[in-house]
Amino acid sequence: MTATPEVQKSIEEVYTKLQGASDCSSLLKKHLTKDVVAKNKSKKTRLGATLLDVIQSGGENLDSGVGIYAPDAESYTLFADLFNPVIEEYHNGFKATDTQPAMDLGEKNVGELADLDPEGKFIVSTRIRCGRSLQGYPFNPCLSETNYKMMETRMKEIFNSITDPELKGTYYPLTGMDEETKKKLIADHFLFKEGDRFLKAANANRYWPNGRGIFHNEKKTFLVWVNEEDHLRIISMQNGGNVGEVLARLIKGLNLVAAKAPFARHPRLGWLTFCPTNLGTTVRASVHIKLPKISAKDDFKKICSDMKLQIRGIHGEHSESKEGIYDISNKQRLGLTEYQAVRQMYDGLKKLIELEKAAA
């Protein structure tokens, strides 16, 4: 299978645009060389994805940090000339010869994660999430409307079968959602919107809102987003800083879903996701935290970066901090175990809280 001449021309146009954009510093621009374009512009995956599907978001959004997405699982292998160097640079030197370790969620280690902030002075809330792709389905740009609906039906059956009192709850499909339910989910910060301009340009919003929905338990501490950026985002959260409790609930919920729906895993890259930044463990362990003193210092970002922590505003990626509250998470997802990813966040935050106390 070969990409059409029109697609190949569009790929060359994206390359030319990126090279001429002095204000663009994405990993796509850096690693989409003339040689990579020449070698890969005619290739097509079995599901019909081309290099254009991989690069179009970064070509349209010159302020992207990374700029590439995988339209299907095969893309990670077929377009490895581009994915491998981007993955290596983003994921802390994870080379093309490296392999993601076997899964270790940390069942035996949960007890080591004592509450980071028992007095409740700093941490507003704690959240751990992971992404999963259902085996046998492509990612967003290659999904048909039928695919979306089939995946949603499968997940509804799983949700309806949950008997664990901590996890059982209700599934809310986005299709046909009434205003009252919508308002309630927005108030709880559970409702995800149509993808932003980065995802839109990557063709991740097709057939919206079909096949999309949200499941949450009665206590609103366990959530599953269906067909947002990834097929599944499995989330455990609660107020305060008890990371151990949050992780234990995530493990229980993830194991429950995994027993009934096999997930797509790559022998080298681990759990597969639409965006290469989430590969491997896919784990993002985060807190909303008040750090008014050290966040005012010039080297705050460097302190976090040195501890492999990522800072965002509390309204997610590409948002600013409000009232000195930051969303701080582990940056590394690949080349370490799931438990190590959580531990990276935990140990870094312990240190940040010590620094904040010392600055008082």
Swiss-Prot record:
**Which Gene Ontology molecular-function terms are recorded?**
arginine kinase activity; ATP binding; creatine kinase activity; kinase activity
Q: What keywords are assigned to this protein?
A: ATP-binding, Kinase, Nucleotide-binding, Transferase
Enzyme Commission identifier(s): 2.7.3.3
- Annotated TM spans: none
Q: Give every Phosphagen kinase C-terminal domain span.
A: 122-359
Concerning InterPro entries, the annotation shows: ATP-guanido_PTrfase, ATP-guanido_PTrfase_AS, ATP-guanido_PTrfase_cat, ATP-guanido_PTrfase_N, ATP-guanido_PTrfase_N_sf, Gln_synth/guanido_kin_cat_dom
Gene Ontology cellular-component annotations? extracellular space
What is the organism of origin for this protein?
Caenorhabditis elegans
Family recorded in the similarity comment: Belongs to the ATP:guanido phosphotransferase family.
- Which stretches are annotated as coiled coil? none
The organism's superkingdom is given as: Eukaryota
Query: What is the name of this protein?
Result: Probable arginine kinase ZC434.8
Indicate which residues the UniProt annotation says bind ATP.
125-129, 189, 233, 284-288, 312-317, 327
Q: Which GO terms describe its biological process?
A: phosphocreatine biosynthetic process
Under the heading PROSITE patterns, the entry gives: PHOSPHAGEN_KINASE (PS00112), PHOSPHAGEN_KINASE_C (PS51510), PHOSPHAGEN_KINASE_N (PS51509)
The reply on keyword ATP-binding is yes
Instruction: Give the catalysed reaction(s), semicolon-separated.
Output: L-arginine + ATP = N(omega)-phospho-L-arginine + ADP + H(+)
Q: Does the entry feature the keyword ATP-binding, yes or no?
A: yes
Q: Which residues form the Phosphagen kinase N-terminal domain?
A: 10-92
The top EC class is transferase
Ligand binding (substrate): G65, V66, G67, I68, Y69, E229, C275, E317
